[in-house]
């Protein structure tokens, strides 16, 4: 368990919870996989404006890695 997990909890559980909240808001099922991909897309969108930091790219890659881990949830 990494330092972020101590603060935010398990990444798969966290993205499943994000998916549940987005599902309720959108009235459409959003899976943990969907949530992780959409978080990566948010980071991609940020690269279009201003001067994105290296962290933006690292975060986008990390969200896609999480999406890979969540694909069966």
List the predicted regions and their residue ranges.
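Intrinsically disordered, low-complexity regulatory regions
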Residues: 1-73
């Amino acid at each position: 368990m990494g330092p972020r997990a101590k603060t935010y909890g398990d990444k798969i559980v966290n993205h499943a919870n994000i998916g549940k909240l987005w599902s309720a808001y959108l009235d459409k099922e959003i899976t943990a996989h969907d949530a992780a991909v959409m978080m990566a897309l948010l980071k991609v969108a940020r690269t279009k404006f201003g001067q994105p930091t290296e962290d933006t790219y690292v975060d986008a890659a990390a969200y896609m890695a999480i999406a890979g881990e969540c694909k069966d949830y």
